[in-house]
Curated annotation (Swiss-Prot):
NCBIfam families: GTPase_EngA, small_GTP
GO BP of this protein: ribosome biogenesis
Function: GTPase that plays an essential role in the late steps of ribosome biogenesis.
Similarity comment text for this entry: Belongs to the TRAFAC class TrmE-Era-EngA-EngB-Septin-like GTPase superfamily. EngA (Der) GTPase family.
Gene3D superfamilies reported for this sequence: 3.30.300.20, P-loop containing nucleotide triphosphate hydrolases
Protein name per UniProt: GTPase Der
Cross-referenced Pfam families: KH_dom-like, MMR_HSR1
Gene: der
Keyword Repeat: yes
Entry keyword GTP-binding: yes
UniProt-annotated binding residues for GTP 2: 183-190, 230-234, 295-298
Length: 439
């Protein structure tokens, strides 16, 4: 089911993220010289010889380290190995064989998964002799590459796809709905995703900011197939000191751009912040479907009016997106968690909704009869025809006598009429006006 999964594993700093980014063709994993900088799995789609597959970049495995983050990275890598169809075991040809390599090899042998041993950092022909000592790992013939110079990658990928050539290379997967979970650090994004997935998929610990990068997880449910993107929490600029944090802020915005639905998570005990408004404002500006989730609702003292009051306050602070859907949950206790993906799917359905042209024009004709367009200057707006030209978000073109005659208040009226007649809750809609000469 689905595309084959290829996991890139190995001890820290052997070049996994550099290789991953070369294969993905874009800078997906955070790459820095600090050991352990790729702290969680990151996914990307790849293709070679018409075979489509999913790659996983794992945090480096340090088998005997007691450091809390490293030990959690090791567990994450083990989960990636279990999920993978083929494993690329990356070692460092410059440093040579290390004890940690032997321990990783032992872990891979136990998995009984197909493994392609890849010796990285072989930048020159004369360095190829460095690969021989890795035969001692008992993993098979090594492939030599230089990920930084993109040398030998074709040979490596030939070996990888060899393992799933028997599988049918089907063309299209069912479309997955991309959902980005955004919000301040420690608002409960990773905890909610883990609850939805039913596995310890994301690093969750007491150390602030343990989701440094944006992480993808896949889940299939009765409501559809989803990609869940957990983003690093956005801090105020004064707190963003390390380079690593700057990368993560950029990645959060990039995650919003590739999402279909953005879920803003708010801490019920803290309420909405200026930072929350800023980040969801960006999602609104680039026309994403939006669901606002108030987490930690179990910690709030409440009566039967508390939720309505809280929602009313949120709507005031988020008045620029009156269409947003709201959900009050507790990721910790599981309260209403079952509704998260269902509600996100409703937002997505509205985000991709198409309205028949005949029905659309009937609604707009009725709206014009109820409220005639105002005169702007010396001309009155005439609407001849309207049609939907796209989705994500639903986009409508009105053919009119003069686009300059459209007053913002009348445009808002037309949008409200569309919303009243068709359910667009959870998504923005776009109205465009084009001139058409009257015949």
């Amino acid at each position: 089911m689905g595309k084959p999964i290829v996991a890139i594993v190995g001890r820290p700093n052997v070049g996994k993220s550099t290789l991953f980014n070369k294969l993905a063709g874009k800078r997906i994993a955070i790459v820095q010289d600090t050991p352990g900088v790729t702290r969680d799995r990151i996914y990307a789609e790849a293709e070679w010889l018409n075979y489509k597959f999913t790659m996983i970049d794992t945090g480096g495995i340090e088998p005997k380290s007691e450091d809390i983050i490293v030990s959690q990275m090791r567990r994450q890598a083990q989960i990636a190995i279990e999920m993978a169809n083929v494993i690329i075991f990356l070692v460092d040809g410059k440093e040579g064989l290390a004890p940690a390599d032997e321990e990783v090899a032992q872990m891979l042998r136990k998995s009984k998964k197909p493994v392609v041993l890849v010796v990285n950092k072989i930048d020159k022909l004369k360095d190829e002799n460095n690969a021989y000592e890795f035969y001692n790992l008992g993993i098979g013939d090594p492939v030599t590459i230089s990920s930084s110079q993109a040398l030998g990658l074709g040979d490596m990928l030939d070996r990888v796809v060899e393992y799933f050539k028997d599988d049918e290379s089907d063309g299209e997967d069912d479309e997955r709905i991309n959902i980005a979970f955004i919000g301040k650090p420690n608002v409960g994004k990773s905890s909610l995703i883990n609850k939805l997935l039913g596995e310890e998929r994301l690093i969750v610990s007491d150390i602030p900011g343990t989701t440094r990068d944006s992480i993808d997880s896949y889940v299939d449910t009765e409501f559809g197939e989803f990609t869940l993107i957990d983003t690093a929490g956005l801090r105020r600029k004064s707190k963003v000191k390390e380079e690593i944090e700057r990368y993560s802020v950029i990645r959060t915005y990039a995650s919003i751009e590739r999402a279909d639905v953005c879920i803003l998570m708010i801490d019920a005990t803290e309420g909405i912040s200026e930072q929350d408004q800023k980040i969801i404002g960006y999602a609104h500006d680039i026309n994403k479907a939006i669901l606002v989730i108030v987490n930690k609702w179990d910690l709030v003292e409440k009566d039967d009016k508390t939720m309505d009051k809280f929602k009313k306050e949120l709507k005031v602070n988020l008045s620029f997106m009156p269409y947003a859907k709201y959900l009050f949950i507790s990721a910790k206790t599981g309260q209403r968690v079952v509704k998260v993906l269902q509600t996100a799917k409703e937002c997505y359905d509205n985000y991709t909704k198409r309205v028949k042209t005949g029905v659309l024009n009937d609604v707009i004709s009725q709206a014009i009869m109820m409220k005639e367009p105002p005169i702007v200057g010396t001309k009155r707006l005439k609407i001849y025809y309207v049609t939907q030209i796209g989705t994500k978000p639903p986009t409508f073109i009105f053919f009119v006598n003069d686009p300059a005659c459209i007053h913002f208040s009348y445009q808002r009226y037309l949008e409200n009429q569309l919303r009243e007649n068709f359910d667009f809750q959870g998504t923005g809609i776009k109205l465009e006006f084009r001139e058409r000469k009257e015949k």
